Every structure is written in C-alpha cells, then in structure tokens.
From Swiss-Prot:
PANTHER family: 5-METHYLTETRAHYDROPTEROYLTRIGLUTAMATE--HOMOCYSTEINE METHYLTRANSFERASE (PTHR30519). It comes from Thermoplasma acidophilum (strain ATCC 25905 / DSM 1728 / JCM 9062 / NBRC 15155 / AMRC-C165). This is Methionine synthase. Pfam families: Meth_synt_2. Catalyzes the transfer of a methyl group to L-homocysteine resulting in methionine formation. The physiological methyl donor is unknown. Its EC number is 2.1.1.-. GO terms for biological process: methionine biosynthetic process; methylation. The keyword Methyltransferase applies. InterPro entries: Met_Synth_C/arc (IPR002629), MetE_arc (IPR022921), UROD/MetE-like_sf (IPR038071). Pathway: Amino-acid biosynthesis; L-methionine biosynthesis via de novo pathway. The gene is metE. The keyword Glycoprotein does not apply.
C-alpha cells in the first residue's frame, strides 16, 4: 500500500524507568538493557496503534535531538543549558576545533530496531542546518562553513547506516528523515539550508524525507523544493489549525500552505510526497477521529493523489504521556482507515 501511509515522526515519551536513569547509566550495559526494553515496549504501542511505518521505535536511545549527535562529535564542547522552543532545555555546544565524529550516532540503534521488528522503519537524524543554528561557532569562518562541516559528518553517519542497513533490512527500503526545525529561522540563509542538506545525503541510497515543524512561513521551504535532493516532506499543520470540524478554508486554516506546496509540486517532473501533521503534539486533547478525517480530506482535496499524502503527528510525541500519545496515534490510524474505505 502506498496511499495515505501512516507514520511516526520520531520521539515518544520514555518510560520512567529509563528517563530517570538515562544520564546516570548512559553508555553502560545497564543503559543498553533499559533502552532496548523501552524500544520493544514502544514498538508494541506503535503496532497496537496500527502504524504502517514505526520510525525508529520512539528514539529510546536518544535523550535529545541536538545533544545526542553533538556529544559524539570531536571539536564540540558544552557551555551549559539553554531553553528550546518547546520550553525544554538542552546543552548547547560550541565548535572550537575542526569537527570529526568520535563514534557513530545511531548505527547500534538501527541494528537493534531493524532486528526487533519486520515493519517499515524510518531513521530520523538531526540535520546540518539545525545543528549549526543550535551551536555556538568559535572556530569556523562563517555559519555556512560550520553547516557544511556538520553536513560532511552527517553524510558519513548516513553512509554507515546505509552500510549496516544492507545487513539487517530483510529487503526493506532504507528511509531517512532529516530533522530540520530551524529551516526557516533565517530567510536569507535558505541557500545554506539547501546546500548543507544536499551535501548530507550525497551518495546515500534510499528514500530521503525532511521534517520541519513550527515554521513561521513554509513557503520559504516550498520555494526551494526543486533544489532539494530529497523525496518528500513531513510537516506540522495541526498546531496552527482549528479544532472545529469542516472542510472549508476557515475551518482548516492550518492547512492553507498546502495550496502553495501543491502549486510547486505540480511543476516538478518527479513529484514529492507530503506527510501532513494531523494531530497536535503540544496538547493533551485527543483529536476525534472525525476531525482528523476532515484534515486528511481537506489535504486530499488540494493534493489530489493519495499516494503523495502521508499521515503523521505534527512532530515527535515525547511531550505527551505515553497513554495520550497512543490514543492520538490510534485515532490517526482509524481516521486514515475510514478514508481508505471511501477511496
């Protein structure tokens, strides 16, 4: 099936037994044991929910999307904690020397998850522009230079993942998701965004998508779709939408940008898919199946081809309880299933 594939974006709330001990036991056999246990339990949640693509099992091996790779890069030191956009905190690093990988970021995680489930997977990895934007630069001549260095390192990581994937995939296609929440932070740096992402995925054989959330203007990204060497986009829309039912523009205000995406996509010889965020990860309110159906149907009215539309939460569900997260995913899949019956 390729129509309206349901997918998870990345993170999911860690069980308390892992979250409370994470930093105390990281990089020990005990950590591996608990992270593997949490991954198996989260995969069960995703499979109970009916997801087609179960990501990487909720990122149980990762504490935070910036800190995890930054800790594994030589040339970065950490100065302290800063607040992120979702009112959580991360350790912000600074590039003080030439960047080199100390060790792989996600290879062991990919091996474990691929060997634990036969479902399709998607490996999220923090993109070069966001790594640059969220770092201090005390070494390189320019922001562009730093972004391209992160791109070089990410390309090494992706090639290692691709190599391992051949051994553990069981015939499944490699799917990579470049996470770039900082994409449109500086409109005058979109050339850096494009060049660094293209460098990151150079020579990597597989399906490449890009995840962006909470952008003030997706049109900055859409304008560069012809230049980006990726296959699709998984984006946030529900956080900016209403909670009212309906298929009119005033009810589906959060999805208006899709019209511009469709216009750009129509001009391409090789069309890109769009993963639409149909449930808000920043509220505990569990959107009713009927509301999610309206959001999907509205998107289909704009995009047309259901093979070009995928269904996902706005972002990772780590900010919600595991129970709320599962309910949101379950309703999302139910809404998709209802629509498939009508197609």
């Amino acid at each position: 099936m390729t129509a309206l594939i349901t997918q998870e974006i990345g993170s999911f709330r860690k069980p308390d037994y892992l979250a409370k001990e994470f930093h105390k036991i990281e990089r020990t056999p005990k950590f591996t044991e608990l992270a593997e246990r949490a991954t198996r339990e989260t995969l069960e949640v995703f499979e109970r929910s009916g997801l087609d693509n179960i990501g990487i099992g909720g990122e149980m091996f990762r504490w935070e999307m910036y800190e995890h790779p930054a800790e594994r890069i030589k040339g970065i030191i950490f100065y302290g904690m800063v607040r992120s956009f979702d009112n959580r905190y991360y350790r912000k690093g600074s590039a003080i020397d030439r960047l080199e990988r100390r060790e792989p970021f996600h290879v062991d995680e990919v091996k474990f998850v691929a060997g634990t489930t036969k479902k399709p997977l998607k490996v999220p990895i923090t993109g070069p522009y966001t790594m640059m934007e969220w770092s201090f630069n005390d070494y390189y001549d320019s922001r562009e230079d730093l972004a391209m260095e992160f791109a070089r390192i990410i390309n090494e990581e992706l090639k290692d993942i691709a190599s391992v994937w051949k051994q553990v995939s069981g015939g499944r296609r490699l799917e990579i998701q470049i996470d770039e929440p900082a994409t449109t932070t500086h409109p005058d740096e979109m050339d850096i965004v494009v060049d660094s992402i293209n460098r990151s995925v150079q020579g990597v054989d597989g399906e490449i998508s890009m995840h962006v959330c909470y952008s003030s203007d997706y049109r900055l990204l859409y304008d560069r779709i012809p230049d980006l060497k990726i296959d699709g986009y998984n984006l946030e829309y529900s956080n900016r939408d209403t909670l009212e039912r309906g298929l009119t523009d005033d009810k589906r205000v959060g999805f208006q940008d899709l019209k511009y995406f469709a216009q750009i996509n129509e001009s391409l010889q090789r069309k890109k898919f769009i993963g639409i965020g149909v449930t808000d990860v920043h509220i505990d309110y569990v959107e009713p199946v009927e509301l999610i159906e309206d959001r999907i149907n509205y998107a289909l009215k704009i995009i047309g081809d259901p093979d070009l539309v995928r269904i996902n939460p706005d972002c990772g569900l780590r900010t919600r309880s595991r129970e709320i997260g599962e309910q949101k995913l379950r309703n999302m899949v139910m809404a998709r299933n209802n629509i498939l019956k009508q197609l």
